Amino acid sequence: MNKNVVIKSLAALTILTSVTGIGTTLVEEVQQTAKAENNVTKVKDTNIFPYTGVVAFKSATGFVVGKNTILTNKHVSKNYKVGDRITAHPNSDKGNGGIYSIKKIINYPGKEDVSVIQVEERAIERGPKGFNFNDNVTPFKYAAGAKAGERIKVIGYPHPYKNKYVLYESTGPVMSVEGSSIVYSAHTESGNSGSPVLNSNNELVGIHFASDVKNDDNRNAYGVYFTPEIKKFIAENIDK
């Protein structure tokens, strides 16, 4: 994909896909759902991998990258503080992997929309495997890379409050990878910010942060591609 096209699209046609008041879609949800029904799936069991690696914020998504450590977007974490809570892989009223308190927030120093969040190891509300965060979740591993044409999936909590924290999985092809940017054609909505972008082996390719406002067959979504520098930052900030 031409770089200038991507930049113009990001500048003019994208929304940040959390529901924190940063951006709102200009098309009705009914139209979006009809457009995406062939590649969006409701997750039935969040207690199996890869879904055990996903966590919910009040208005967005995150995922586990190591001991007591979650990744999300800067535009998500700026609305949270130490002591606030996250929920591990909730499944509406069918339970969750525990509720945990945030103990540290570290934003990536570059322009990329990446933020590390460390949580207290002991749950405020226990999960099915006890009170320990690491017993109730599964960290993701990195993919070797990604390229145009490969299939990816985005797993997260679109419209989390409205959808009662039901987890959804959306799939589509990679359109382009350039530097720390990855563009893909997968349907995402408000609340998907911070969702993991995974390859067919459920390995991390990047983190989702925005999507086009337009609603047609050319609607793209945007993520931060995990470069060696970003992986190094994450590794250095995993809880010890």
Swiss-Prot record:
GO cellular component, one term: extracellular region
Active-site positions on this chain: 75 (charge relay system), 113 (charge relay system), 193 (charge relay system)
The UniProt record lists the keyword Zinc: no
Organism: Staphylococcus aureus (strain NCTC 8325 / PS 47)
Cell compartment(s), UniProt: Secreted
Pfam families documented for this protein: Trypsin (PF00089)
Keywords in alphabetical order: Hydrolase, Protease, Secreted, Serine protease, Signal
Signal peptide stretch: 1-36
Protein name, as recorded: Serine protease SplB
Family of the protein in this entry: Belongs to the peptidase S1B family.
Known EC number: 3.4.21.-
